[in-house]
Amino acid sequence: MFHRLLIATVVGILAAFAVAGFRHAMLLLEWLFLNNDSGSLVNAATNLSPWRRLLTPALGGLAAGLLLMGWQKFTQQRPHAPTDYMEALQTDGQFDYAASLVKSLASLLVVTSGSAIGREGAMILLAALAASCFAQRFTPRQEWKLWIACGAAAGMAAAYRAPLAGSLFIAEVLFGTMMLASLGPVIISAVVALLVSNLINHSDALLYNVQLSVTVQARDYALIISTGVLAGLCGPLLLTLMNACHRGFVSLKLAPPWQLALGGLIVGLLSLFTPAVWGNGYSTVQSFLTAPPLLMIIAGIFLCKLCAVLASSGSGAPGGVFTPTLFIGLAIGMLYGRSLGLWFPDGEEITLLLGLTGMATLLAATTHAPIMSTLMICEMTGEYQLLPGLLIACVIASVISRTLHRDSIYRQHTAQHS
């Protein structure tokens, strides 16, 4: 057992460096091509001329598509999904290393060019890839799946600064169980990855800075639970829209470069209305949490960002939809909170409270992982006082969503690429 914990520590270190490598590559490309050193794609888009804001996501999608198509022709095989660690856990625990690296590079291109897709998917993939490479050299074959799981959890912990949520992501979403024998090394890897990532970044700050001064009372629990019901209804709708957009892009029968370029062009067009559609939504989430906008502003940005996410994911842009889902949930919660705030004197606090609730519950509704979703929001924001209410709301959202839409976002993604 102790040798497993030692290996888990090594896996956590490797995962932290894999995530840091991808993050620094992003910053380098943003500096080279967008003249942006802030780390925020929204800031980069704001400072670009309209024609560059329009064309940059399309050119990034075109470059990524050419890379994927070139690799497909070179290897004479159909590309796999970018989330290969899920396939590896469901099969024999082996990776196609070269294909995974190519997809990570393609993800780097679309992410840094502004597509509304998550960068964390590629980070987690690289972390799992590093863990797999180490495991195949130093561990027996029957343990390979365990170390891939540890790498994925560690990558998630380093990307989101949420080690417990990263561990439970593996337990709830990938393993479908919470066996202690498997969970121990996973938690060790996740915690080590977070600590090493903090050392690399010279910071142990929370992912999101939130100033929530409300003390949760009976009324607030009722509002939180009602938000869970709303998210439980919105989750299946979001999954249905994503599936419909994917089918729509496929029906066009475009070559991969042109399909990804079309998705990027749609993002570019939407960015002419608001630069907030660029990127995975992290900086927009932070700005909303710092100062919740008015109802109509939230609604406008929400609609544009939703269309951008659907265009990016539907076109097949390699990357994750985890962080974009957090923004969509935040916007839904804040829209609900702003509407209710008209009837309460503390409308600002209600808006912020229900925004955080929306993040957790929509994540639970799309992943069907309520415990992970609850812990993730608490770890990212430090608002652990919300834990009891969020847990109830996330369970409700997950149950409603699972009733209306059997597949989670991950199973749907795997089915689309199978």
UniProtKB/Swiss-Prot annotation:
Record Gene3D superfamilies: Clc chloride channel (1.10.3080.10)
Segments traversing the membrane: 2-22, 54-74, 146-166, 178-200, 222-242, 258-278, 291-311, 316-336, 352-372, 380-400
Single GO MF annotation: voltage-gated chloride channel activity
Location(s) in or outside the cell: Cell inner membrane
UniProt topological domain (Periplasmic) ranges: 23-53, 167-177, 243-257, 312-315, 373-379
Record keywords: Cell inner membrane, Cell membrane, Chloride, Chloride channel, Ion channel, Ion transport, Membrane, Transmembrane, Transmembrane helix, Transport, Voltage-gated channel
Domain of life: Bacteria
Cytoplasmic side: 1, 75-145, 201-221, 279-290, 337-351, 401-418
Matching Pfam families: Voltage_CLC
GO BP annotations, alphabetical order: cellular response to acidic pH
Any one GO CC term of the record: chloride channel complex
Membrane topology: Multi-pass membrane protein
Family: Belongs to the chloride channel (TC 2.A.49) family. ClcB subfamily.
Function: Probably acts as an electrical shunt for an outwardly-directed proton pump that is linked to amino acid decarboxylation, as part of the extreme acid resistance (XAR) response.
Listed name of the protein: Voltage-gated ClC-type chloride channel ClcB
Organism field: Escherichia coli (strain K12)
